A protein has these predicted regions:
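Thiamine diphosphate
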Residues: 1-144
């Protein structure tokens, strides 16, 4: 590598994928899914909102390694009010995510809203349609 090429690249760390705020970071697709709720939290903060995230899904999902990547990124997720709790199955995970988005139903909520992320496999999506249908009909809190 030429001298000027290394200067252009700069110092690179494996933590960049979660630690960098305003520059390019290289990551896998799974790592991008892990970073997504952190970015949403940053966007909400810039709008003056105090939000959190709740992530759940079925560990047997074909999104291999997402649960492990979320656990590994916990120090960064904690800084952005992101909670990961795997579900026993897709139905329970989807129900938990929807429930986390109902902050407007209770007085004294700690957050302006909780946005959610759910994942599952094909047959689990079919089974979870009841929850998804009710969540779409009932909705979420304003910032959920």
């Amino acid at each position: 590598m030429k001298k000027n090429q290394s200067a252009a690249i700069g110092k690179v760390s494996l933590d960049d994928k979660y630690a960098l705020a305003a520059t390019r970071a290289y990551m896998t697709g799974i790592e991008a899914l892990v970073r997504l709720p952190m970015l949403q939290h940053q966007r909400d903060q810039s709008r003056g909102l105090n939000t959190a995230a709740y992530i759940s899904g079925y560990r047997g999902s074909p999104i291999g390694g997402l649960d492990q990547a979320l656990w590994k990124a916990r120090p960064w997720l904690d800084k952005h009010n992101v909670v990961f709790q795997p579900g026993i199955n897709e139905d329970l995970a989807a129900t938990a995510v929807w429930g986390s988005q109902q902050t407007n139903l209770f007085e004294g909520a700690r957050y302006d809203g909780v946005f959610g992320m759910w994942y599952g496999k094909g047959p689990g999506v079919d089974r979870s349609m009841d929850v998804i249908k009710h969540a779409n009909a009932f909705g979420t809190s304003r910032y959920g």
